[in-house]
Amino acid sequence: MRRLVNDGYEAVEEMLAGYVAAQGKYVDFAENDKRVIVSKQMSEEPRVRIIVGGGSGHEPLFLGYVGKDFADAAVVGNINTSPSPEPCYNAVKAVDSGKGCLYMYGNYAGDVMNFDMGAEMAADDGIRVETVLVTDDIYSAENVEDRRGVAGDLIVFKAAASAAAKGLDLDAVKQAAEKANANTFSMGVALSSSTLPVTGKAIFEMKEGEMEVGMGIHGEPGIKRTSIEPADKVVDQIMGYLIEEMKLTAGEEVHVLINGLGGLPVMDQYICYRRVDEILKEKGVHIHSPLVGNYATSMDMIGMSITLVRLDDELKDLLDTPCDTPYFKVD
């Protein structure tokens, strides 16, 4: 195992302790729960609070986006495991200001069950909690409502957080998140598994020199395994699926996110972006504020995903609204 951990069973707690110590300008633990990270820069004015969360191992996803005018709290589960209902509830209690809270997370069964239980507990206290599930992974299911959430989490979280920062009510904030989700499309490729710190073993088997297009961030099966191909061929394949799914046409405008899965060098990520840029320009599609980097990872997995967001003036404004967190800033 090529990981720098101590006791694998303590990896999440030690990571959280280090994160809060390093990012104390932005975050702290909730008073009664060290699986809840809360913003130290929440608006003093009552407004809708944004709560995100899910399993560990995808950092900076979730906890890295808690800060000013973005997420107000993140609920942290064990590696690739949903947080339990209690911290989901505790996050609401920690940040609610009387305007209600919006839960947002990727569409995975364990997360849905436990966050729903947290929302029910909050409702018993008279606190309204709504939920938006992120479903951007186009290969994971034919029906959109059954799809998984991957790197598109970042886009949906940002849209909702911007709406909340503008002072919109809970229904309008939820609507902004749903609109962003409906216009966000992702697909990835894996060239290796990730490694569990508890066992030191890969979460799935992949031979050296293989790749799998469409694989999920937890190792969910993709389209097929083949020998690793040149970057342009891989990008062409993924972009073909995305463009077909979106029915993308000349004159449209999109936001592009090239997301590293943890082990892919930055050099490779920009090589992939270069090809995406070429494809979209050849098609007459305009690109707005592209992002390249590690935003939603799978520990040390070698791979990347491409996310395209169909834009209109409203979504552009929401994505361009200023925010400040340890791992995402808009000036």
From Swiss-Prot:
A Gene Ontology biological process noted in the UniProt record is: glycerol catabolic process
Q: List the disulfide bonds.
A: none
Top-level taxon of origin = Bacteria
Q: Which SUPFAM superfamilies match?
A: DAK1/DegV-like
Recorded metabolic or biological pathway in which this protein acts: Polyol metabolism; glycerol degradation
Top enzyme class, one word, equals: transferase
Oligomeric and partner information: Homodimer. The dihydroxyacetone kinase complex is composed of a homodimer of DhaM, a homodimer of DhaK and the subunit DhaL.
Q: What else is known?
A: Unlike the carbohydrate-specific transporters of the PTS, the complex DhaKML has no transport activity.
Q: Write down what this protein is called.
A: PTS-dependent dihydroxyacetone kinase 2, dihydroxyacetone-binding subunit DhaK
Question: Lineage, please?
Answer: Bacteria, Bacillati, Bacillota, Bacilli, Bacillales
Question: What is the primary gene name for this protein?
Answer: dhaK-2
